[in-house]
A protein has these predicted regions:
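Short amphipathic alpha-helical interaction segments
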Residues: 60-68, 132-141, 201-207
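Low-acidity, Ser/Thr- and Arg-rich intrinsically disordered low-complexity segments
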Residues: 356-362, 366, 370-382, 386-404
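A short, conserved structural fragment
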Residues: 70-80, 145-153, 213-220
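Phosphate-backbone binding and catalysis cores of DNA-processing enzymes
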Residues: 1-131
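Loop-centered beta-sheet repeat module
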Residues: 139-211
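Short, leucine-enriched amphipathic alpha-helices that occur as contiguous helical runs
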Residues: 107-115, 171-178, 315
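Glycine-rich, small/acidic residue-mixed loop/short-helix segments
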Residues: 273-351, 355
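Non-catalytic regulatory appendages
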Residues: 214-270
């Protein structure tokens, strides 16, 4: 890697990721904003995770927003369930098509058999597995051909349907997938891209090398990494502070991290173990740009485990965020429970705080409130125009989900 051009602080990295991830100011409703919210895909491996990720980024989100005609569901990075923009289907499918001949032929052959068997029908993946005499979980290996879409709502088996293959060169799709990753998760490395995308490290490194002329090396507290050169100015300016509170669902892109990137987001190793568990991850509580705890939901009950004592204002903001969840299965309002007592005298001096024993409070489900947003701007993409926001950064002194669903 070339000599880094800029030393980035932790605050700069997190502020940039929050800004490009639309976690500082919610976007206005509409397909353009949905595509931007899903710029690196929305993992939907837990029921309604993608919906709550959209809610954290787009105002006016409704219970059926995840099923908007502009969005589709597929097996994407790491063969996990993802919601992506229909016009970006090639990026998240063909962008992961294996490079080696044997693996690619296996994917193409399975996809051809699947398409022929479906013959225009939509069927459960169990039915398709029995029809093709393969384990249903193997069907996801056909997804990188771009010809397979799924529909999964959490309660039943996913259904599968075949669609025409996108008219995009897989190499171009792979390059765009790297660009998406570096824009949302940057600064990042080829190896971290490989881990996120679920492809071989050697293939990831080759793709990054192909983009080297459009990348800039940066030094971060966890090591040297790449950013898109076009993103460099955004790292040098002070972004507006993060909105008061966001409740990010299990697997949300903001903390869908591995290795040292987790250390950057959550420096305390004990807290990292609470967020990135060995089983289903809880959701992350984001307040003023910092992860301050975890949350889980069961029906109307949202249980919040804070990592230190919070101010009355922070608590109110978190409860209001929970109350606005656009969930179809909540009748009579969300009930928030604060789990345990947290914070030390040293932590309590950071801001006016209150002591929190385990308490619960029922909040009417008012649905998503409208939050002021700014206008949208356009950016270029080799495959399709990239929607990004024209949220002019302003000066700020701030640095920058049983499952939770």
């Amino acid at each position: 890697m070339a000599r880094p051009r800029l030393d980035l602080t932790r605050a700069q990295v997190l502020a940039f990721r929050q800004h490009v991830g639309a976690l500082d100011v919610r976007l206005p409703p509409g397909p353009h904003s949905l595509r931007q919210a899903a710029w690196a895909g929305l993992q939907d491996s837990m029921p309604r995770a993608a919906l709550l990720s959209i809610h954290a980024r787009v105002e006016g989100t409704k219970p059926d927003t995840w099923a908007d005609p502009s969005l589709v569901q597929l097996w994407g990075p790491r063969f996990s369930t993802y919601v992506v923009a229909e016009q970006d289907r090639a990026v998240f499918s063909l962008g992961r098509l294996p490079d080696d001949g044997d693996s690619r032929r296996a994917a193409e052959d399975l996809a051809a058999r699947l398409v022929a068997f479906l013959d225009g029908r939509t069927m459960t993946y169990g039915e398709v597995g029995r029809g093709l005499v393969v384990h249903p979980n193997q069907l996801r290996y056909a997804a990188p051909t771009g010809t397979v879409l799924i529909r999964w709502e959490g309660a039943r088996q996913p259904t599968i349907r075949a669609v025409p293959r996108p008219m995009v060169d897989p190499r171009d799709a792979r390059l765009e997938l790297v660009r998406r990753y570096l824009h949302v998760f940057g600064p990042a490395t080829a190896d971290s891209f490989a881990s996120w995308a679920g492809i071989r490290p050697a293939h990831a490194r080759a793709t990054v090398d192909a983009l080297i002329e459009s990348l800039t090396p940066m030094r971060t507290p966890i090591g040297d990494a790449w950013i898109l050169t076009e993103d460099e100015p955004a790292f040098r300016i002070a972004h507006s502070g993060a909105t008061a509170a966001r409740l990010l669902p299990s697997g949300d892109a903001y903390y869908l991290l591995q290795g040292s990137d987790r250390e950057l987001l959550v420096p305390d190793p004990g807290r990292r173990a609470e967020l990135w568990t060995s089983r289903v991850w809880p959701g992350a509580v984001l307040v003023d740009g910092e992860v301050v705890g975890t949350w889980r939901r069961a029906g109307p009950d949202v249980v919040i485990q804070a990592w230190h004592r919070l101010s009355a204002g922070d608590r109110a903001a978190i409860e209001a965020e929970a109350a606005s969840f656009p969930l179809p299965d909540v009748q009579g309002g969300i009930r928030v429970r604060w789990d345990g007592r947290h914070g030390s005298a040293r932590q309590a001096t950071k801001r006016p705080e209150i002591d929190r024993a385990a308490t619960s409070r029922t909040i009417p489900n008012r649905g998503p409130g409208r939050i002021p947003t700014n206008s949208a701007r356009k950016s270029s993409s080799p495959i399709a125009a990239a929607p990004t926001t024209d949220r002019k950064p302003g000066p700020s002194s701030r640095s920058p989900a049983a499952g939770c669903l």
